[in-house]
């Protein structure tokens, strides 16, 4: 049986590790480096370059050199963040037939998972060269805040690369595995702050020692799928472009070649400013105009860089607050803070994390390699090579379906330990409804429109029945990879339909904010919308039951009473259309009052029938039975008052 390798598929860099002799080993690539740039280039002769060779030729082949493609996985072309990237990236981002954001190189459209597959293939080859045998299985990491379709796309990328993805695990969880394996026995709570090249995650994890077994339980996770080192680089690029325009009057944003050189220089400057207080960006012959060639030389101090990215660092703190709150722990309960991702080497980031958590972050974890190491440990667990380790991960966002009135009914709450399964019984909204559409959603908002749509499917051939009668059981099943399977079953017929949510689009930055951060801010708005839906549904149900009762027992009341009920029903129907909650509730109350006589008539008939049956059975006096009937009617009327 071959080895299961662990791969950290990063936005900027990737890394591969394997268990050897019970210990994780990070494998050097063919260039001798322990990490590989997540860069893929398509040469003119059809050759595909991956890693350092691709990065080296980027300046001369900017339009066909792809980087940071992980940020496009599962995203729609129309999304604001994708549109922003279109202006920033030297390569072409194109719209796929299904509306997804793809890339275009040499006149051919390519899906992001295909590009990621090239990087995975390089990681696979790196491991095979080291092990001297074929590798077919892997554990691949993803940002904890990746949604279902993004996880599915990552799994697809593995399949394209010729790998069977045995498990998808969250990057902070993998880092916790790498950190916690060699720690002394005993319980501890850790915070993993993961600021990588393109994404940010924070996870609160409890490491417990239970009968000699290491148990890693994720208590809560949060993050931002569009915040990372690439954004820090971009701030430097924007600053240089602005300064150069002031000095030379030339806008470098229109020059693809210049932008590619600037990107390399910005990344280098950022790294240098982590250890030095000042750096110089010097790019001779950066561009030319009618007056001749232009040279770029600009000094950037650490203080200036920090001021440029201050808001980006601040953006990472709010998810930390939410994660602590969701985990039910205080800052003082955190024993260790682990920093993961190359961007955490920036002194200002370390300072901000220290300020928030009130303690110095650990320095004994390699931020570039910890995630891959954790992935290989999980591979060892799956293979049986690593024993006494239990990993309990969570789903980052709530999952549910759209129900009557556009409400999201949650079946699985965020931060639920996976794998997990949940079922709930729903019914039809109309009489003789023969099919239901199950609309699957992911997010935290009360109303369906505020959440991410993951897909929908139909359950048809439901036998004709009054509304509310059919029983449709909807089951959500999240596997250990965090990937969702949904089924709907008609309990009467046993007919069932299933769906594995397919990757159709990702979560935009705006969508994530709407789902998680803004959930609290919009709580009042959501509550009002929910109350309106409840009022509508209750009023609608009352109209339906009154219509039915009037059809069956209308002959037992006077014409005036019947007219009053019909008028009240019409008013209630108009109120539902108005969308005014107070009006709906008032008209519902009026309809209930108008229907009182009808209710009394129905009740009186039932009591009379019941009394007659009792009299026949007992053979007693009719007077006594009549008295019983009168008493019962009197009691009911008294209650209604």
Curated annotation (Swiss-Prot):
Pfam families: HSP70 (PF00012)
Keyword set includes GTP-binding: no
Gene3D superfamilies assigned: 1.20.1270.10, 3.30.420.40, Actin, Chain A, domain 4, Substrate Binding Domain Of DNAk, Chain A, domain 1
Biased composition (Low complexity): 604-616
Cysteines paired by S-S bonds: none
Recorded superkingdom: Bacteria
Database matches in InterPro entries: ATPase_NBD, Chaperone_DnaK, Heat_shock_70_CS, HSP70_C_sf, HSP70_peptide-bd_sf, Hsp_70_fam
MF terms (GO), sorted A to Z: ATP binding; ATP-dependent protein folding chaperone; unfolded protein binding
Coiled coil regions in record: none
Keyword Chaperone among record annotations: yes
Region (Disordered): 603-627
Keywords from the named record: ATP-binding, Chaperone, Nucleotide-binding, Phosphoprotein, Stress response
Induction line: By stress conditions e.g. heat shock.
Annotated positions of the Phosphothreonine modification: 199
Family: Belongs to the heat shock protein 70 family.
UniProt cross-references to NCBIfam families, sorted A to Z: PRK00290.1 (NF001413), PRK05183.1 (NF003520), prok_dnaK (TIGR02350)
Alphabetized HAMAP family for the sequence: DnaK
Protein purpose: Acts as a chaperone.
Protein name, UniProt field: Chaperone protein DnaK
Gene: dnaK
């Amino acid at each position: 049986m071959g080895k299961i390798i662990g791969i950290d598929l990063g936005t900027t860099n990737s890394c591969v590790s394997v268990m050897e002799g019970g210990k994780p080993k990070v494998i050097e690539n063919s260039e001798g480096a322990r990490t590989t740039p997540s860069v893929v280039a398509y040469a003119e002769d059809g050759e595909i370059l991956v890693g350092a060779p691709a990065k080296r030729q980027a300046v001369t082949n900017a339009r066909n050199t792809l980087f940071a493609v992980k940020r496009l996985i599962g995203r729609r072309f129309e999304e604001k963040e994708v549109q922003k990237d279109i202006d920033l990236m030297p390569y072409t981002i194109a719209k796929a037939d299904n509306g997804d954001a793809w890339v275009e190189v040499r006149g051919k459209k390519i899906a992001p998972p295909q590009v990621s597959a090239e990087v995975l293939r390089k990681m696979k080859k790196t491991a095979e060269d080291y092990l001297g045998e074929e590798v077919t299985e892997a554990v691949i990491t993803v940002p904890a805040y990746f949604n279902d379709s993004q996880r599915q796309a990552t799994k697809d990328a593995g399949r394209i690369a010729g790998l069977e993805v045995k498990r998808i695990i969250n990057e902070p969880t993998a880092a916790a595995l790498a950190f916690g394996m060699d720690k002394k026995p005993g319980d501890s709570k850790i915070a993993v702050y993961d600021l990588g090249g393109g994404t940010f995650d924070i996870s609160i994890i409890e490491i417990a020692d239970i009968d000699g077994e290491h148990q890693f339980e994720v208590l809560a996770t949060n993050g931002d799928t569009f915040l990372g080192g690439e954004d820090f680089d971009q701030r430097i690029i924007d600053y240089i472009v602005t300064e150069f325009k002031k000095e030379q009057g030339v806008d470098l944003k229109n020059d693809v070649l210049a932008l590619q050189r600037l990107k390399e220089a910005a990344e280098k400057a950022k790294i240098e400013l982590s250890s030095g207080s000042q750096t110089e960006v010097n790019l001779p012959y950066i561009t030319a105009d009618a007056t001749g060639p232009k040279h770029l030389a600009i000094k950037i101090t650490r203080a200036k860089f920090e001021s440029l990215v201050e808001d980006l660092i601040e953006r990472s703190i709010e998810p930390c607050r939410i994660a602590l709150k969701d985990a039910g722990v205080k800052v003082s309960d955190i024993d260790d803070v682990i920093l993961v991702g190359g961007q955490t080497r920036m002194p200002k980031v370390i300072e901000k994390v220290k300020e928030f958590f009130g303690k110095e972050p650990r320095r004994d974890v390699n931020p570039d390699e910890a995630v891959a190491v954790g992935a290989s440990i999980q591979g060892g667990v799956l293979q049986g090579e690593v024993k006494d380790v239990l990993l309990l991960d969570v789903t980052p966002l709530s999952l549910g379906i759209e129900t009557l009135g556009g409400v999201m009914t949650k079946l699985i709450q965020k931060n639920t330990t996976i794998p997990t399964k949940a079922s709930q019984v729903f019914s039809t909204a109309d009489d003789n409804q023969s099919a239901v559409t199950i609309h699957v959603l992911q997010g935290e908002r009360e109303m369906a429109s505020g959440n991410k749509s993951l897909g929908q499917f139909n359950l048809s051939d439901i036998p004709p029945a009054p509304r509310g009668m059919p029983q449709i059981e909807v089951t959500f099943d999240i596997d250990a990879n965090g990937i969702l399977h949904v089924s709907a079953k008609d309990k009467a017929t046993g007919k069932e339909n299933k769906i594995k949510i397919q990757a159709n689009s990702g979560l935009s930055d705006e969508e994530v904010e709407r789902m998680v951060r803004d959930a609290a801010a919009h709580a009042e708005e959501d509550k009002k919308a929910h109350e309106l839906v409840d009022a509508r549904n209750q009023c609608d149900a009352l109209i339906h039951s009154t219509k039915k009762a009037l059809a069956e027992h209308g002959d037992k009341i006077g014409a005036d009473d019947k007219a009053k009920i019909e008028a009240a029903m019409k008013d209630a129907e108009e109120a539902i259309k108005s969308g005014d909650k107070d009006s709906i509730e008032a008209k519902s109350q009026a309809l209930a009052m108008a229907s009182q006589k009808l209710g009394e008539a129905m009740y009186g008939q039932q009591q009379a029938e019941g009394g007659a049956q009792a009299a026949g059975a007992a053979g007693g006096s009719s007077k006594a039975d009549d008295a019983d009937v009168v008493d019962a009617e009197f009691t009911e009327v008294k209650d209604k008052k």
